[in-house]
């Protein structure tokens, strides 16, 4: 009797957990948004703002300093490539303390 009751509780808890996890997944999917108007310098955008833009390549950097230094280097490379927008894919510290690796995808209108 106790085992059957415990199985029922576990089954209900597992069902509730599954429903909560599935609803959380839908919260992560963003609906496409338009990119901001083009300016004279590249702008960082989110992944859901890339619809309708032309991908022109990707860039990566490895710098000593801080994450802000890595992002500044990404922006400088986007300027050199004459990109209108860029999406930062990752900024991560390497095994070496103070050395940062970053990647971004470049887009044009």
Curated annotation (Swiss-Prot):
Disulfides per UniProt: none
Lipid linkage positions (S-diacylglycerol cysteine): 25
Sites of N-palmitoyl cysteine lipidation: 25
Expression triggers: Up-regulated in biofilms.
GO cellular component: plasma membrane
Disruption of the gene: reported phenotype: Mutant exhibits reduced microcolony formation and greatly enhanced flagellar motility. Biofilms from the mutant strain are less able to resist acid and peroxide stresses.
Subcellular location(s) of the protein: Cell membrane
Source organism, top-level taxon: Bacteria
Entry's Gene Ontology BP terms: DNA damage response; response to stress; single-species biofilm formation
Topology of this chain in the membrane: Lipid-anchor
Protein name as annotated: Lipoprotein BsmA
Organism: Escherichia coli (strain K12)
